């Protein structure tokens, strides 16, 4: 029991000594030396503090096209040397590193300059590591919402170049000098600058909509601003990302193309169905709905029209032309000889030339001299007979009926009339009413056949116009669809992040100092 108490006392004593050493060190640095966090860590006012910066990307959360905002989860790595925080480890029990609150130290106050929500600083102020050499290392996490101008030219087959621009709003280029982080290559033992955004494969979460193509980092010097200005220098991290278009291809592009090709089916639909205008108007309304959906996903900009917007406008113009064509076709189809007279050029072009060029079948023609057989109902014949009798005068009909009623026609004596007629004349007198009725019916049937034939010619003109527009609209739709979408499919990000710079800014190709 005594041995256990002795061991426990030794552990407590050793822990207390360690804590006391850190407390004594902190008291020595901040109280005895009189550390002032408001003063830059330089021996003289003309010296410049070198601040090194690096960015580790944990997650590309989203890119909101409407707000033009890039949301990222990052770690902002900052390091510098503060000569006032140096100590001899042998004097403080071998303590070589301190973990201090950021409020206790001088900070370069580096912020995200192109933020889009008014939050310039990091979200969480974690502890700062201070080493005995005066080296200060700070790695705070942050969720940044940065401004990213969207180029909608090739949406949804687009790529974007977004930036995270860091600078110090409190100190100018004469007070601090910003650099990219420097590391040492263990193989060559040479130093190099980290000229890219760091991505840890184990801690990085892939984005389902965007693919990172390039992620370079640069220090930018702006000679147009004086060194006394905070805008003279900055460290900018670039994210060149390409959209994964599968979602939009499945949900917008494919339905748009299928609905667009439904518009040409209107030329196959017979005019007598009465559904031609219904079909084409439905297609036009569907395209309008898709255009509204696309406009809600993109920023309200007048700089460019997105690729899918160009296609929808092209389809709407084409469908509008189809609506006009359908109106003309229906007008031709329901024309009659009583309202319109077909001109010779219309007859020659639409009944002779175009049907032959379009390989349209001609209606079967009756042989020369063959009677035209038409189906007529008995009611029609009765109506025509009644029309015949209505043509004759009432006096003639009354005389005939009265003669038949009183038998005068059979009791005519040769004494009161002229000599008896021949048998041919008597037969002619009996057959004349029947022949007149037959001639009237034949005349009417000829007029009806001529009327129907002319109406059929107008129907053939409408069908020819339908077939002609089918052969014209279909290639236009196919070529327009391929041309517009091939522009987007072959829209790739540049092979190098910066035009004119042969360096690719990747870990595999380090530039040694």
Swiss-Prot record:
It is found in: Postsynaptic cell membrane; Cell membrane. Residues 19-244 are extracellular. Residues 1-18 form the signal peptide. Its main location: membrane. It is a multi-pass membrane protein. PANTHER family: NEUROTRANSMITTER GATED ION CHANNEL (PTHR18945). This is Acetylcholine receptor subunit delta. Glycans are attached at residues 88, 161. The chain crosses the membrane at residues 245-269, 277-295, 311-332, 468-490. Disulfide bonds join 148-162. Residues 333-467 are cytoplasmic. GO terms for molecular function: acetylcholine receptor activity; acetylcholine-gated monoatomic cation-selective channel activity. One of its GO terms (biological process) is membrane depolarization. It catalyses: K(+)(in) = K(+)(out); Na(+)(in) = Na(+)(out). After binding acetylcholine, the AChR responds by an extensive change in conformation that affects all subunits and leads to opening of an ion-conducting channel across the plasma membrane. GO terms for cellular component: acetylcholine-gated channel complex; neuron projection; plasma membrane; postsynaptic membrane; synapse. It comes from Gallus gallus. The keyword Ion transport applies. Belongs to the ligand-gated ion channel (TC 1.A.9) family. Acetylcholine receptor (TC 1.A.9.1) subfamily. It comes from the Eukaryota. Keywords: Cell membrane, Disulfide bond, Glycoprotein, Ion channel, Ion transport, Ligand-gated ion channel, Membrane, Phosphoprotein, Postsynaptic cell membrane, Receptor, Signal, Synapse, Transmembrane, Transmembrane helix, Transport. The gene is CHRND. Pentamer of two alpha chains, and one each of the beta, delta, and gamma chains. The modification Phosphotyrosine is found at residue 388.
């Amino acid at each position: 029991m005594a041995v256990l108490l002795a061991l426990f006392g030794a552990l407590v004593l050793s822990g207390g000594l360690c804590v006391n050493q850190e407390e004594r060190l902190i008291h020595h640095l901040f109280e005895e030396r009189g550390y002032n966090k408001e003063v830059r860590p330089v021996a003289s006012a003309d010296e410049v503090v070198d601040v090194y910066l690096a960015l580790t990307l944990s997650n590309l959360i989203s890119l909101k096209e409407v707000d033009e905002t890039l949301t990222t989860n990052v770690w902002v790595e900052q390091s510098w040397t503060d000569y006032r925080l140096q100590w001899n480890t042998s004097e403080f029990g071998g303590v070589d590193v301190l973990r201090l609150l950021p409020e206790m130290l001088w900070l370069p106050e580096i912020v995200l300059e192109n933020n889009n929500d008014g939050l310039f600083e990091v979200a969480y102020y974690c502890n700062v590591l201070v080493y005995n050499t005066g080296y200060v290392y700070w790695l705070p996490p942050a969720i940044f919402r940065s401004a990213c101008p969207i180029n909608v030219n090739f949406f949804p087959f687009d790529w974007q170049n977004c930036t995270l621009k860091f600078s110090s709003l409190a100190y100018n280029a004469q007070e601090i000098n910003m650099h990219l982080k420097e590391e040492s290559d263990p193989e060559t033992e040479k130093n190099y600058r980290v000229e890219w955004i760091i991505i840890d494969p184990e801690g990085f979460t892939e984005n389902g909509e965007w693919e990172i193509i390039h992620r370079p980092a640069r220090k930018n010097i702006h000679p147009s601003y004086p060194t006394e200005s905070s805008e003279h220098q900055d460290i900018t991290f670039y994210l060149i990302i390409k959209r994964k278009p599968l979602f939009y291809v499945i949900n917008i592009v494919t339905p748009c193309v299928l609905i667009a090709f439904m518009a040409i089916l209107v030329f196959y639909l017979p005019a007598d169905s009465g559904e031609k205008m219904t079909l084409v108007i439905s297609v036009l309304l569907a395209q309008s709905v898709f255009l509204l959906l696309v406009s809600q996903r993109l920023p309200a900009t007048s700089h460019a029209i997105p690729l899918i917007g160009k296609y929808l406008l092209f389809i709407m113009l084409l469908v509008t032309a189809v609506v006009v064509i359908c109106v003309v076709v229906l007008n031709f189809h329901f024309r009659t000889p009583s309202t319109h007279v077909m001109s010779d050029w219309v007859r020659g072009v639409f009944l002779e030339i175009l049907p032959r060029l379009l390989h349209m079948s001609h209606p079967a023609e009756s042989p020369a001299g063959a009677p035209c057989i038409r189906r007529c109902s008995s009611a029609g014949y009765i109506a025509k007979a009644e029309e015949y009798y209505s043509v004759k005068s009432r006096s003639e009909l009354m005389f005939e009926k009265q003669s038949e009623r009183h038998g005068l026609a059979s009791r005519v004596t040769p004494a009161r009339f002229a000599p008896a007629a021949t048998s041919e004349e008597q037969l002619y007198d009996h057959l004349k009413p029947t022949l007149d009725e037959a001639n009237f019916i034949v005349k009417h049937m000829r007029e009806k056949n001529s009327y129907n034939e002319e109406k059929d010619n107008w129907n053939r003109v409408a069908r020819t116009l339908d077939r002609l527009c089918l052969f014209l609209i279909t290639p236009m739709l196919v070529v327009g669809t391929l041309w517009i979408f091939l522009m987007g499919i072959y829209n790739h990000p540049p092979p190098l992040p910066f035009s004119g710079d042969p360096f690719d800014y990747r870990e595999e190709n380090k530039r040694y100092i």
